[in-house]
Amino acid sequence: MANIKSNEKRLRQDIKRNLNNKGQKTKLKTNVKKFNKEINLDNLSSVYSQADRLARKGIISLNRAKRLKSKNAVILHKSNTNSTAKKQ
């Protein structure tokens, strides 16, 4: 337990930020699940914007955001090529 006032304040700030960051990460996971359930460009753009925002704020690493965006773009591309192949 912190005995110094500045340490106590820092602890309070860390707890508040941790809760906020957890909520933001949960929103990202929800957007990814929504994209995986219904694969379309609108859901992909929401995943992109959310991942970019979290990476810019430092909540997730920049490399993790890039991997996430790349993985979901591949999924969208594969679903589009499969749907066009089925039509022919």
From Swiss-Prot:
GO CC terms of this entry: ribonucleoprotein complex; ribosome
Alphabetical keyword list:
Ribonucleoprotein, Ribosomal protein, RNA-binding, rRNA-binding
Q: Where is this region: Disordered?
A: 1-25
Q: Name one GO biological process term.
A: translation
Presence of the UniProt keyword Ribosomal protein in the record: yes
What's a single GO MF annotation on this record? rRNA binding
Alphabetical list of HAMAP family matching this protein = Ribosomal_bS20
Family stated for the protein in its record? Belongs to the bacterial ribosomal protein bS20 family.
Q: What is the official name of this protein in its record?
A: Small ribosomal subunit protein bS20
Biological source species = Mycoplasma genitalium (strain ATCC 33530 / DSM 19775 / NCTC 10195 / G37) (Mycoplasmoides genitalium)
